[in-house]
Amino acid sequence: GKKVPRAAISLEILGRIERRYRLSAGYFLSLSGTPDRAPGDFDLNDISPSERRRLAWHLPEDFNRRPSQEKAEILNWVRTVIISGSTDYRRYQAAAIRQRYAVRFSCASGPVRKSSPARTPEESGIVIAPKRLNDEMADLLRFKTSTFAAFGMQRNGVWGTETASQKVEHFGLWFGAFVAPPESEVQGLGVDPKLLTFAMMIFPQVWDWYLHWRERRRGFYTKWEIDLLSIAAAICREETGWLRQSPRMGSSLRPIEGLVSEADINAVQSDWPAACDRMYKHARRRIKEIDRVARVHRDPFEPILPVLEAPSPVGEYRKITEEILQRMPDERHNARAAAEAVRAFLMLRIGLHTGLRQKNLRELLLCRPGALPTSERKLEDLKRGELRWSSRDQGWEILIPSVAFKNANSSFFGSKPFRLILPDLGRLYELIEAWIERHRARLIGEAADPGTFFVKTAKMTSTNAAYCQNTFYEAWRTAIQRYGIYNPWTKRGAIEGLLPHGPHSVRDVLATHILKRTGSYEQASYAIQDTPDMVAQHYGRFLPQDKSEIAARILNQVWEAA
């Protein structure tokens, strides 16, 4: 037959036959290749189908035969460690996601999470921005993203596409807090959406209400509040502040019960520059006060701590790619599963070799062997890189113009492009070629080819094969869940103690690896296309014992020579 057994009962019967005829464990499955999916008949009737599919990947084949208490223990472990990640921040985030609140702007493009089909945006906590508020958001985006500031306006710095998209989301959450009903889980202020305007941001008491609301939700302050206050200060700054240069917006202000009175509005409208100065000083003062007590909620090192603590962080992380190769489905029987495994392997391997941010990875274009590579000028216009075959170096080359990077003005680039020849090691070239020739097309199917090297699996419900920020993150995270995290119940997974994480973590791995080997922040910065200061502040986990070990290694050479 063409179908491979995948039901738990089928696998159990095969195991009995193997024991009866003294065959090696897994003999029959080895003939048909690695199963392409998890068993489909686990006893999980009280769990929703979507969660059942996620859990099934991580349950042992004999799950149905285990005692009820042990089943509950397994399910709890899988949910806590693999599905959600057991960090304090992940638990907070999981709870916060269920409490949806935001104002959605139609003037900005970007990925939008789907609401439940049975719920309207309003029922799901999402409020569509009224026309006036939407127009104000569009005006701010023009001010911060256009090539030139409008005549008569001054500005300090511009936003790139990614930054603009992020700011739109942050403003949506800011206004969403005021709109959310007080009796809801969000415990907002219940303001009528028609009263919302960016001019609200000129009032110190409005910001103080929001800051106290943030503290109630999280329990403490973080750098998030400092970043928001920095925006408040920037838009009110003398000469270059967008709000400061838009006094006409004062006419949009209306009283908000318990927050903004008619007298407050009259005072602001009568002297707009003075009101902006007052808000600017208030924001700077609050930034200093919060900076003193701010705590770190999301520790970026926590999910990958077992990797960073290893003597060779890159060698430890590489185990995940070896696990993928070891469990690679047989392409003859499970073509799509094999293609997805190859994609996961290439994501991690290319990430480890380049240290690229996920935007640069997911937008990497593909030039097939024999085709004419895209010119550097066109790549600059597209702000994307390309993977192409280099005839000169006889290897796969990644070329990315400096303007495509988040830190394009960094001294690392000096206005020159990033160029790297990938090494022909560990089956990398073999699987790149297999991906281009066969696997990539299988995942695209009937969908339009986006032209990128990495593509997602196009399905009936999602015919777009191009990755966005969220789907690329989920693809990486899924690879870590399936192949990276050691599961004591199934004995699968590469690294014990690892937790789910996204592509950005690979930059921490590379920087820490080089720091442990060389002690040089300068050399560590080369691996992730950044500066030594950025490595020291954000990426490298370089502990005192690591520094002492490097010094001891050098000093011990004297005694070894003697």
What are these regions (language model features)?
Residues 223-226, 311-359:
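Basic, Lys/Arg- and aromatic-enriched nucleic-acid-binding interface segment
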Residues 370-371, 499-500, 519-540:
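Short, polar N-cap/turn motifs at the start of nucleic acid-interacting alpha helices
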